[in-house]
Every structure is written in C-alpha cells, then in structure tokens.
C-alpha cells in the first residue's frame, strides 16, 4: 500500500527509481507506523523524490538538491547514497529515511514543531512535560551527543527527528540514558 500509494520521482541525474529503492525506503519509513493507533500511512506524503547523492546539496543547476526550507510538505526528498549508507549501519545514530519521515509525522497537524499528533490527553500532557525545554536541556546536556547538539540549536522539530533516529538506531542507549523520553517515543 505504501509503495503503490506514493509517486516516486527520480531527480538530480538519477536514471530511475528501482524496486529496490522503493522497498528499502518503504520498509524503513513504515517502522514509524508500528504500534500507532492513529495516522494514515503518511497520507499527506504524495511524492518521494530520490536524488543520487547528498553531495548535490548546495550545488547549482537543475540537478541540485533544493534547500530543506524549499521542500513542499507533501514531498520527501532523499539522497540514495545516504539512504543506503544509513540503512546498512544500524548503530550509527543516523538514518536518512527515519529522519525525513519523522518530520512527516511531526507535520501531520500542519506544524513542524516537534510534537506529533497525540490523541490521548494524558499522553499529550506527558509529551508536553518531557519535550519542555527545561527537561530536555537537563537530560541531553547531561549525557551529550547528537540530541544535545540539536537542542542547543533551539529547534524542537530537529530534536524530535534526531530522537526518532536514535530510538530506532540505538534504542537500548536511549532507554538507558533517557527513559522518560524513550517511553514517549515508544
């Protein structure tokens, strides 16, 4: 359903979107949908645009990756070299597909604010407390790492995307170092 329900577009000199590309991306993106009682298979994502390489970022011309703030919210742009690299190493804290689709979960309510749609009021209150700047500052500056760096940048959406990557890439570490945050993502 995910593969057939999206428009797949090759960009930046990529010759074609292959079945391998679709399955690799869909398999990782759909991890984010497991155990969710709500949401519609990334219904707002209409197009997945695949570029051959992240090195096209900042380039000029028709093959260049557009800047992140120029992406329409109905599109997910991915660099195939990064998708393959981050999919291979399950313990490097990075996953291109999970990060970009975490942003889509964040956008389900129309705002990229680090707060995905949560229907249960108790969960909403707990999420607000755990995601509050004070809690995050204490938790992540104490233990350092990528999340602390994202937090100091002051962008809750980036913190959510990076934390989601960490949840799938290194769940034991996240659970050990930040148990409340882990439970919110679970």
Features from the language model and the residues they span:
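Metalloprotease/metallohydrolase-associated module, dominated by Zn2+-dependent proteases
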Residues: 8, 26-35, 55, 60-88, ...
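Amphipathic alpha-helical interface segments used for dimerization/assembly
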Residues: 3, 105, 185-186
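Contiguous, non-catalytic segments that form substrate-binding/exosite surfaces or channel walls
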Residues: 1-59
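Active-site recognition of the HExxH zinc-binding catalytic motif
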Residues: 92-109, 161
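Generic beta-strand structural signal
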Residues: 46-48, 74-76, 94-95
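Short, well-structured alpha-helical interface segments that form or flank functional binding sites
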Residues: 20, 88-92, 96, 156
């Amino acid at each position: 359903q995910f593969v057939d329900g999206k428009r797949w577009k090759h960009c930046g000199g990529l010759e074609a979107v292959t079945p391998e590309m679709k399955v690799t991306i869909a398999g990782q993106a759909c991890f984010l949908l497991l155990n969710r009682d709500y949401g519609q298979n990334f219904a707002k994502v209409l197009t997945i645009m695949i570029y051959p390489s992240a090195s096209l970022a900042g380039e000029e011309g028709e093959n260049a990756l557009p800047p992140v703030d120029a992406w329409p919210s109905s599109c997910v742009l991915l660099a195939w070299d990064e998708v393959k690299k981050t999919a291979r190493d399950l313990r490097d804290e990075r996953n291109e597909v999970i990060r970009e689709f975490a942003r889509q979960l964040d956008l389900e309510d129309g705002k990229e604010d680090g707060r995905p749609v949560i229907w249960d009021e108790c969960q909403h209150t707990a999420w607000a407390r755990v995601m509050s700047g004070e809690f995050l500052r204490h938790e992540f500056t104490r233990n350092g790492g990528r999340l602390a760096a994202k937090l100091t940048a002051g962008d809750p959406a980036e913190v959510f995307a990076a934390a989601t990557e960490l949840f799938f890439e290194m769940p034991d570490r996240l659970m050990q170092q930040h148990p409340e945050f882990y439970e919110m993502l679970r």
